[in-house]
């Protein structure tokens, strides 16, 4: 599907004029990992040998932390005075960084930005790169939410995914994490190579034995420019993967997890605040190699991208010039991107949120909304707009309504 912004009648005559700035989050990218997974299309680069610098490893932690902080300093004029509600360390594998490195980053973040006192601070970790003392150090540094990339508890499937950890290591990592964190997310994947419905449900059942506060269950997709795209494995067909999805949703609903976004399930009040800000079209400042930003001003919305290659980023960041590209979003882009994000939420969004986050009147997409409702993909009650169950199942078809015709 070619994604183009929508072009509703009258949109071009509307001016962007924000009266209230959206909530702001901070994303920090750590680009290194132990081994690139064959399905991964994120900006990640293998670091060999993977040891901490104190043990003679190759990860340039000290230099990268300095570059991140210089990056943040250079971005301050764009976010001056705005409070940060969440911080997210993503990758790559952020848990490759030492506890001291994470602590230094967060120390400087607190000095440079007004961080909310109850800010959600998440760090992604892989079971194969964690030790008990590291978890304790991350918690002491100020991280209050851990996201573990489990993917599966089946050793055969872990090998097929190119993961470096075993099922036993995954279980050990969860047990250690729960000694230090009371807000834990587990990432799982389904529709894996040669996976059966029973195996997919068993992965979720095993995760439930630990009662995590949050579960993310992702359908494996073959992304361009990945090893799996070039050498596709044998995957379950559409009917089988759909049965897995429905079975997972039913199992988690029965255990009290709210299915609040396409792939996200949470205990009450344990939704990912950081990701919710993305889906509700909030602002985010991204620092680090390849990080993206979306920032609103009174008269415009901009997107930025940092240099992707770690060395290019390091060289540019220390000079205070980490941004490789920047664009001002058109009003068409703003309206479309809001819908593309907000319609991922199962409960949708309040109508007033559209104008708050885009500065555009909802009236401008009334024809698209009418069409989606007529096709049974969308429901409205005068206050809230949300995808129907059919719209959730066929989200791409729903989004297609808000895309411009291809030329």
Map each language-model feature to its residues:
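Flexible, acidic/Gly-rich N-terminal and inter-domain linker regions that tether
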Residues: 1-24, 34
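C-terminal scaffold of the Radical SAM
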Residues: 18-25, 42-78, 82-360
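Conserved N-terminal Rossmann-fold NAD(P)-binding element of oxidoreductases
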Residues: 28
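Local cysteine-cluster metal-coordination motifs and their immediate loop/turn environment
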Residues: 31-44
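Short amphipathic alpha-helical interaction segments
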Residues: 359-371
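A short, conserved structural fragment
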Residues: 374-383
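Minor-groove-contacting beta-hairpin "wing" of winged helix-turn-helix DNA-binding domains
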Residues: 384-388
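Short, amphipathic alpha-helical interaction segments positioned at domain boundaries
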Residues: 390-407
